[in-house]
Amino acid sequence: MSRTIFCTVLQRDAEGQDFQLYPGDLGKRIYNEISKEAWAQWQTKQTMLINEKKLSMMNVDDRKLLEQEMIKFLFEGKDVHIEGYTPPSH
């Protein structure tokens, strides 16, 4: 059975996560405030960041950078900026 939450990113009610995707208090906040749709948006941004900045998840500093960008995107309304990337026009 799906849960409905008020999504911080989308600013509307949406389907919530099925389980906590991230550890600790931040993970609890994501579970309670971030919808599946918004999490999918973040995953796309995260993949771009990892690829364009050549981040390694084995590197503690790279993981910290990714977590900071995730917080900015999910909770502060700031889009991920990747130098040299131009989004496709619709």
Curated annotation (Swiss-Prot):
User: Which species is this UniProt entry from?
Assistant: Pectobacterium atrosepticum (strain SCRI 1043 / ATCC BAA-672) (Erwinia carotovora subsp. atroseptica)
Q: Does the keyword Iron apply?
A: yes
Tell me the GO BP annotations in alphabetical order: cellular response to oxidative stress
Q: Which InterPro entries match?
A: Fe_traffick_prot_YggX (IPR007457), Fe_traffick_prot_YggX_sf (IPR036766)
Name a GO CC annotation attached to this entry: cytosol
Role noted for this protein? Could be a mediator in iron transactions between iron acquisition and iron-requiring processes, such as synthesis and/or repair of Fe-S clusters in biosynthetic enzymes.
- What keywords are assigned to this protein? Iron
Molecular function as annotated in GO: iron ion binding
Per its record, how is this protein called by name?
A: Probable Fe(2+)-trafficking protein
The record's subunit annotation is: Monomer.
- HAMAP family per record: Fe_traffic_YggX
The record's comment on protein family reads: Belongs to the Fe(2+)-trafficking protein family.
Domain of life according to the entry: Bacteria
